[in-house]
Amino acid sequence: MLRWTTAGESHGQALIAMLEHMPAGVPISREEISFQLGRRRLGFGRGARMKFEADEVSILGGVRHGYTIGSPIAIMVGNTEWPKWTTIMSADAIDESDPDVAAAMSSGRGARLTRPRPGHADFAGMVKYNHDEARPILERSSARETAARVAAATVARSFLRETLGVEVFSHVISIGRSEIDQTVCPTFEDLGRIDDSPVRSASAQAEASMIDQINAAKKQGDTLGGIVEVIVNGLPIGLGSHISGEDRLDAQLAAALMGIQAIKGVEIGDGFEEARRLGSEAHDEIVLRDGVVARQSNRAGGIEGGMTNGESLRVRAAMKPISTVPRALQSIDMDSGKRATGIHQRSDVCAVPAAGVVAEAMVALVLARAVLEKFGGDSLAETKRNIAAYNEYVKTRIAFDGE
């Protein structure tokens, strides 16, 4: 089974992504990974770090001459700020009697962070892991970690492109109270235009409103959340299964997207809106079109009973406003127990545009795993043969003489 994990901290030396059981023969390059990481840095409302953050990519294993070789893939994303943090984030024990070490630890960066931020992992993490400050928690819970997931997912994207000829893309549905017209339905061909939008919106009208909302929040010392939609066209029927809860593709997608920092809700297709409809209005009727089984609509978002049904996959993720609010919220100092305001770290006003790119990454990883579970293969060529045979079967299964 395809597996992935990451290691590293926000201000550590580097982030590491590990990807296991990817078949041999999948094309991948540092340039392609860097391109996706660059997309992750996009977006109006991002903080100062995005202006100088350069993701230095190194492929440490699992790839030779531009192709995966079947062994575990290790990708390192270097941190350009590391020289400023070598003492504070040192993996080795430090000697605080050393003048240089003492100076670093008494600096602004080295200050103990004892005032947890509401909405962040700080408080629960300090208690759970018995830390006397929040630094060990916020370093790992930071959304900087998603850079490693985007790197790993670049391999999954290439695998999906080579095996199924599909692309994973996203756009921003809403930021704050601004949202696009629900009739807007972009395709992968629109991605360049979407990425050129400061807020990654497919609607110029909505874009202007979203930018206004972000500017207003920034002026007020506040932050904003929003909703992104990920779309994949051309998936085969039958990825995932109804057999058990953990096999359901929608459950896997929801778990993966909820695992992104600040994501608080996920819906497949029309999702929550379906709960407000009558049954006769909620489901996608099955018809024959040119002798082939087809659907009248796609309210289900391409998944029924935990399996892809041949329609476009549509999944949305709701991101809460960033927890590090410049206008600091009320908190408690965990040293003294006295009232305080939450610590303030450099952060974004709005990271919804970037969240779309991270959501793409998680969808790509889950889909790549589902493809390998369905079709297997130790090499790309073997997987493609298996898919081709299945596609021939499906053609005969859904074709009928008739209307």
UniProtKB/Swiss-Prot annotation:
InterPro entries: Chorismate_synth (IPR000453), Chorismate_synth_AroC_sf (IPR035904), Chorismate_synthase_CS (IPR020541). GO terms for cellular component: cytosol. FMN binds at residues 140-142, 261-262, 305, 320-324, 346. Reduced FMN (FMNH(2)). Gene3D superfamilies: Chorismate synthase AroC. Keywords: Amino-acid biosynthesis, Aromatic amino acid biosynthesis, FAD, Flavoprotein, FMN, Lyase, NADP. Its EC number is 4.2.3.5. It catalyses: 5-O-(1-carboxyvinyl)-3-phosphoshikimate = chorismate + phosphate. Transmembrane segments: none annotated. NADP(+) binds at residues 40, 46. It holds the Pfam family Chorismate_synt. It is an enzyme of class 4 (lyase). One of its GO terms (molecular function) is chorismate synthase activity. Its cofactor is FMNH2. GO terms for biological process: amino acid biosynthetic process; aromatic amino acid family biosynthetic process; chorismate biosynthetic process. Belongs to the chorismate synthase family. This reaction introduces a second double bond into the aromatic ring system. Homotetramer. HAMAP family: Chorismate_synth (MF_00300). This is Chorismate synthase. It comes from Corynebacterium diphtheriae (strain ATCC 700971 / NCTC 13129 / Biotype gravis). The lineage of its organism: Bacteria, Bacillati, Actinomycetota, Actinomycetes, Mycobacteriales. The gene is aroC.
